[in-house]
Amino acid sequence: MTSTNMTKNKKLLDWVKEMAEMCQPDEIYWCDGSEEENERLIKLMVDSGLATPLNPEKRPGCYLFRSDPSDVARVEDRTFIASKTKEDAGPTNNWIDPVELKATMKELYKGCMKGRTMYVIPFSMGPIGSPISKIGVELTDSPYVVVNMRIMTRIGKAVLDQLGEDGDFVPCLHSVGAPLKEGEKDKGWPCAPIEKKYISHFPEERTIWSYGSGYGGNALLGKKCFALRIASVMARDEGWLAEHMLILRITDPEGNKTYVTGAFPSACGKTNLAMLIPTIPGWKVETIGDDIAWMRFGKDGRLYAINPEAGFFGVAPGTSMDSNPNAMHTIKKNTIFTNVALTDDGDVWWEGIGTEPPAHLIDWQGKDWTPDSGTLAAHPNGRFTAPASQCPVIAPEWEDPEGVPISAILIGGRRPNTIPLVHESFDWNHGVFMGSIMGSEITAAAISNKIGQVRRDPFAMLPFIGYNVNDYLQHWLNMGTKTDPSKLPKIFYVNWFRKDSNGKWLWPGYGENSRVLKWIVERVNGKGKAVKTPIGYMPTVDAIDTTGLDVSKEDMEELLSVNKEQWLQEVESIKEHYKSYGEKLPKELWAQLEALEQRLKEYNG
């Protein structure tokens, strides 16, 4: 489509013109989001060898992509928060002066789209027209980005109609950083070398510039860049929350519904929890979102959440009919797979899919693979991009423009000791304290000499806060003052990953986590037995329904205990963590820590 048919928004038209003059694409194409457009772009990529169609009998409407081996994940050390002052970026973000960064990037962007098309993608984060939604426009030279954005967000003409002539949008500029000379064709996946990759955010201007990567969160700018980094700044300024959280709906046997959000660092089973199949009779979990929640107070003083996305961008390896059957059903059709293995009959395969490796595969790098190869057939960060509407347990109100009222916020991480299976905060501020100290023990999976140490990840937002982490934690504290305390969600810290002294899991996890959710639902409804401990309210040993579960009473006691010695060590570790955030850390959090230490010292278990 041409621009004049699509929009009369002067700010948008001027910006597209200015960016095109800098990037010099061969042509500009405005995306309308139609099926016909999608098929045309897919065909373009199949013809160029970038996309492999999968077997239509096994995976209808599905395609496999292989990226360059240097372009396989988010690049945190090339991700910048270019606020006007370094102080605003804070101690946990990479900062470059915005004037300097723009000058550097303008040099890179000059002529970077030669030989390519500039695609204009108008997109809505959240249902089009929702009072909680926001509009962005991404300019990209990657058709791969267009077909993924079409799944992950709502794109096209309807978004421009909503934007109108003077609506506001977040400008997102993206280039793979690989201009083509006349007559030159791509040899595989286009991207720039690591030192030329920049994923840059200008928070005051609400602008995103990304260069040099075609992959995932670096290139699909609606996801982490907008929905978390820029949106977190908007949320701070406008009095709401943009969070790295799943959203689910739990229905009890009587038909009562409770809505819950949950923040977990990577590799803690967020998507699995969002699509949980409960093992306790009569209970049902349905998905509203698996990754991001935008939350605002409603007229009734309760916190309402929407999922700003329209799809799932999930890690494929480890996803199986055992770990997440609902995800497996979601990705049966109309799904884009990236960096997983291809079977000889045109299906996908990855480690942890639950079936034996076939005798022969084409691996994620396009090479022949056999079980004797000694390498992984799929990249550990191999992905699927699938429409949320295909999830068999998508909740009926997942696109409700008003959002859903949140009764409980879960936080968690992977901790083999110290943190119990579940405990509830005393109040909102104590819950924010728990969120500020959460994290996972560093495992051998991360290349690090810190194995056994805890990587603290406040509210699982460490890589995604668009401003100073201390101001972010203060913003959470401030949110608690904006409504009647009785209307605030209750905050629960869960840990599915406890081990005994022999390194054996104490809790079976997966669907059995519904037993913990049941207690949480009982607690928010004024029921559910609990005992007050130094760290918060803990279920009594008989409060968790263990009917039909092979977990001994001793193990349950271990899972629901406060180990004074381990917790006093934890306090020392938190002190070091807090010191690393510097002088600006909210005084309330230091006060919470001191109070915890005092309660522990007086505790006799």
UniProtKB/Swiss-Prot annotation:
Transmembrane parts of this sequence: none
Disulfide bonds: none
Gene3D superfamilies referenced in this protein's UniProt entry, alphabetically: 3.90.228.20, Phosphoenolpyruvate Carboxykinase, domain 1 (3.40.449.10), Phosphoenolpyruvate Carboxykinase, domain 2 (2.170.8.10)
Pathway entry: Carbohydrate biosynthesis; gluconeogenesis
Keyword GTP-binding attached: yes
One Pfam family, short name: PEPCK_N
Protein function: Catalyzes the conversion of oxaloacetate (OAA) to phosphoenolpyruvate (PEP), the rate-limiting step in the metabolic pathway that produces glucose from lactate and other precursors derived from the citric acid cycle.
Protein's name according to its UniProt entry: Phosphoenolpyruvate carboxykinase [GTP]
UniProt source species: Acetivibrio thermocellus (strain ATCC 27405 / DSM 1237 / JCM 9322 / NBRC 103400 / NCIMB 10682 / NRRL B-4536 / VPI 7372)
